[in-house]
């Protein structure tokens, strides 16, 4: 990876309505024009239906739009037979990249027993398809279920040792915490690229949900934007986008390997960021299909 030209990538999720399906194709057409390094596709809430949701959308991205696609696989909801079938399907779609996760634990969705942790899934995929590029998730501010920082970094090292080629962070809003995390990874011998996951906050509903549910630290500057513009949608959008742009520029300047935008299936914010600071990124995909 050329550190002077870090990657730019996007995350989308499979829609569950007809209107959502129409919207996602329009969104993806617009994201394609930004020449991302890759687009990742999350799992739907019905995690047993990955072939009809995640893989179908990833196939469209990879083969129709000609943008490298990464499919999310949740370890907790898959068994070895399913993963073997999914890997075969990915091969047929010419997709040789995936993001291995444990997956959020949803009480109403039955878990499987084959892969307790993401590292178990990574190890299995690496053995079955050693040519696949495997991404893993990481938490700059510690996984909510980890007992402490040392344990969290140790578990992350296990993912990398199992065959993980790069890491993508959960969203965060305090860059200093990201770089402290990056230093801790280096001290632990974690040498794979760490891509920063960024979610621009551009509307009141999104901000309120984030404030209530996130474990990420919200800096005073971020909270001040919401306090001042909570009931002014246009100004909140402008200020939220400016915050994200400042965050991204700082990350790139200080050596982040790449930026992964959580788009929420909307292209406007990504387009605005590309128009503002697009020259800081690679102009074409670096990850090989």
Spans of model-derived segments:
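Active-site pocket-lining/capping segments in soluble small-molecule metabolic enzymes
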Residues: 19, 113, 117-139, 187-241, ...
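Conserved, mostly hydrophobic/aromatic
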Residues: 11, 39, 90, 159, ...
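Glycine-rich anion/phosphate-binding loops
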Residues: 23, 75-89, 112-117
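Catalytic cores of alpha/beta
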Residues: 78-89, 151-155, 179-183, 203-209, ...
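Glycine-rich, positively charged N-terminal anion/phosphate-binding segment
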Residues: 21-29, 47-65
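Glycine-rich, proline-tolerant flexible connector loops at the mouths of alpha/beta enzymes
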Residues: 35-57, 104-113, 164-178, 264-267
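Conserved N-terminal beta1-alpha1 strand-loop-helix module at the mouth
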Residues: 1-41
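Active-site mouth loops of central-metabolism enzymes
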Residues: 7-23, 69-81, 135-151, 228-242
């Amino acid at each position: 990876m050329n550190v002077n030209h870090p990657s730019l990538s996007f995350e989308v999720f499979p829609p569950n309505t007809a209107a959502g399906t129409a919207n996602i194709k329009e969104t993806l057409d617009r994201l394609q024009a930004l020449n991302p390094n890759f687009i990742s596709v999350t799992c739907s809430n019905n995690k047993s239906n990955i072939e009809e949701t995640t893989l179908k959308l990833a196939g469209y991205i990879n083969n129709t739009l000609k943008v490298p696609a990464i499919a999310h696989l949740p370890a907790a909801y898959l068994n070895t037979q399913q993963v073997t079938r999914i890997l075969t399907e990915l091969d047929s779609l010419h997709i040789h990249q995936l993001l291995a996760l444990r997956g959020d634990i949803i009480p109403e969705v039955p878990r499987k027993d084959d892969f307790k942790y993401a590292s178990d899934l990574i190890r299995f995929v690496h053995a079955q398809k050693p040519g696949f590029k495997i991404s893993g998730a990481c938490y700059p501010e510690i996984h909510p279920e980890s007992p402490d920082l040392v344990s969290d970094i140790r578990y992350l090292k296990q993912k990398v040792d199992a065959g993980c080629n790069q890491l993508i962070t959960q969203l965060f809003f305090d860059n200093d915490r990201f770089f402290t995390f990056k230093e801790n990874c280096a001290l632990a011998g974690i040498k794979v690229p760490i891509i920063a996951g960024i979610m621009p906050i551009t509307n009141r509903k999104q901000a309120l949900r984030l404030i209530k549910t996130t474990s990420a630290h919200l800096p005073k500057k971020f909270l001040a934007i919401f306090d001042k513009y909570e009931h002014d949608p246009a100004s909140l959008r402008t200020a939220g986008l400016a915050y994200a742009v400042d965050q991204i520029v700082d990350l790139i300047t200080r050596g982040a390997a790449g930026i992964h935008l959580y788009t929420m299936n909307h292209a406007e914010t990504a387009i605005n960021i590309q128009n503002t600071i697009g020259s800081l990124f690679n102009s074409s995909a670096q990850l090989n299909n």
